[in-house]
Amino acid sequence: MFRTTKRYFCTSFNRRKNVVVIGGGHAGVEAAAAASRLGAKTTLLTKSFDNIGQMSCNPAFGGIGKGTLMREIDALGGVVSGVCDESAIQFHMLNRSNGPAVWSPRAQMDRSVFKKNMQKTISTYRKNLQVREGAAVSINVLTEDDGKQVCDSIVLEDGTAIPASCIVITTGTFLGGQINVGLTQLAAGRYGERPSLPLSKCLSNLGFKMGRLKTGTPPRLSSPINISKMTEQTGDEIPETFSFLNLERDFSPALPQRSCYRTYTTELTHEIVRKNLAFAPHMLAGDILSPRYCPSLEAKVTRFPHKARHLIWLEPEGLDPNSWWYPNGLSNSMPEEIQHNIIRSIPGLENCNIVRPAYGVMYDYVIPTQLKATLETKKIQGLYLAGQINGTTGYEEAAAQGILAGLNAGLSALGREPVDIPRNTALLGVMVDDLITKGVKEPYRVFTSRSEYRLTTRADNADLRLTPLAQSIGLLDDQTHWESFQRTKSLLDFSNKIAKEFILSPQQWSKLGMPIPNDGKYRSAWDLLSFTNLDLFCVISCIPKLKDIPKRVLQRLIIEGKYTYYIKRQGTQNKQLNCRDESTVIPSDFDFDTLHSVSAEELMLLKTIRPATIGQLKRIQGIKPGTIIRLLRHTYYNPAKEAWLRKVYMPMYDMHSSEENQSTNL
């Protein structure tokens, strides 16, 4: 009894209101900043302050799906979006030829400026955030009287222990990292930087199921480069920023803008790769998977032998005339001398120099089905994971996880209730739900196509979806962000109201140049926004009361009006699909052993993942519809519900059983 009480006063008091974030990458920075903004005393532990803001791979943020994450991070008060806007040397909105639901902002960075701006931003968090240099080697965990495991402290290389009730691990590719250049293997998490080997062993010893993934980065090039042999791509004249605060302002880029250039590999390139595959063991490690949507050059050549060429984007890494170039699409792990031959076989790069060779990197990760929706581990209270340690790839995915893990660590340290973000609220919620219910077999990359709610979780409306939440929990660091949001929302609400009140007959609309059916039906301007044959800005320009509304607000109004019908249809479809599953909670202490006629494989999945809702249960790969019915019976039962369940799920179950029988017969 005395030891328990003594332990409480010696450790629990010191750990209270204390968050330690391990790793100063994109996930770590967002986690530390989020916890700090909430008011929790936070320590950001990094091997070197000079490496905060380091962009390990490509010099760009955003892209398809990723741009939406960047807007969501900003809507939650994150730091990276604003830093990107101030460090960008090209802004480009992707997917303009498609619908607004998949428009994706992207921006090219000046590496050195981004790094400087990020370090400057973190330095402003002086009230609650301390940046400390050091390397964590282990985590001390206490087992309380009820058997629950809780975080106690982290231990540094020099033996120093830092008390912490909440720990966020964001180690990126450093966890058990090994880089490969040809047959040369080095223990490293990034070129020239030591990996975190003891921490990986510690997590394994704590009982976490671990896996191993791989990725790679292309060589860095320097002049002379012959851009006359390439196709130039300029940025947008009017930049679409990541930060909503900058969208509201008359934003002008802080830096001069630069172009990117397009070139291609050749048959000679592919022949060089094929002849030297034996010297790329990184590629040959088939049991360790690399990103499907960012394949290495070796993977592209072997997977698509019929293709005569592959696209290469040459991206500037900065404004300095001596800045390096990043050949996006040339990731590989060939020996350096082979890389020189590859580069010389590509139009425009025949005479350039390799200043840093391409390399592959293998690293450990924690199987993410061991996490809650808050990114807290199920095994240890107060331990959170974010970024590549969860099996994802990409700056944006890491930063988004970082802000979620950091805010929940901060809330926990302050004794407040946790926050999770559901699938229907944000693309961040889709990513986290995919990770914790499905797990990963290859590095996970966000796409809008992964979301069944992509019409409502767009890049343009991330503030409407998430900023009120951020304000309610104290995640916005000052009132500027909130006041900007309120102004925008007020203008949107006003514009929406006026558009719905502006009602004319077909003849009146025709006189204004709007060819609509002459059916005698009066229609509002809002109704006309769903017409595909009209210039929607011309429709809005017909409304006198909206003449002074900023174009950016009118653009958002048009998007909402354009998608109204489709959003309603999406809602109906998802309601039918989900069958109220997201709100049907499975008790956290439910004993899955009480379920009958459940396979051993399913039982193992249920015990490992412990789904929180029926919605999560349905998304677990390997769970049969019949098992869903049985679990719903145990969750709550009434005869009417039983009949409904059989009507909805049994056709699926019968089809599933039929397919199984067919495969058995084969």
Curated annotation (Swiss-Prot):
Its main location: mitochondrion. One of its GO terms (biological process) is mitochondrial tRNA wobble uridine modification. The keyword Transmembrane does not apply. GO terms for cellular component: mitochondrial matrix; mitochondrion. It is found in: Mitochondrion. InterPro entries: FAD/NAD-bd_sf (IPR036188), GIDA_C_N (IPR049312), MnmG (IPR004416), MnmG-rel (IPR002218), MnmG-rel_CS (IPR020595), MnmG_C (IPR026904), MnmG_C_subdom (IPR047001), MnmG_C_subdom_sf (IPR044920). The keyword Cytoplasm does not apply. Residues 1-16 form a transit peptide. It comes from the Eukaryota. Keywords: FAD, Flavoprotein, Mitochondrion, Transit peptide, tRNA processing. FAD binds at residues 23-28. Its cofactor is FAD. One of its GO terms (molecular function) is flavin adenine dinucleotide binding. Belongs to the MnmG family. Component of the MSS1-MTO1 complex that catalyzes the 5-carboxymethylaminomethyluridine (cmnm(5)U) modification at the 34th wobble position (U34) of mitochondrial tRNAs. This is Protein MTO1 homolog, mitochondrial. The gene is mto1.
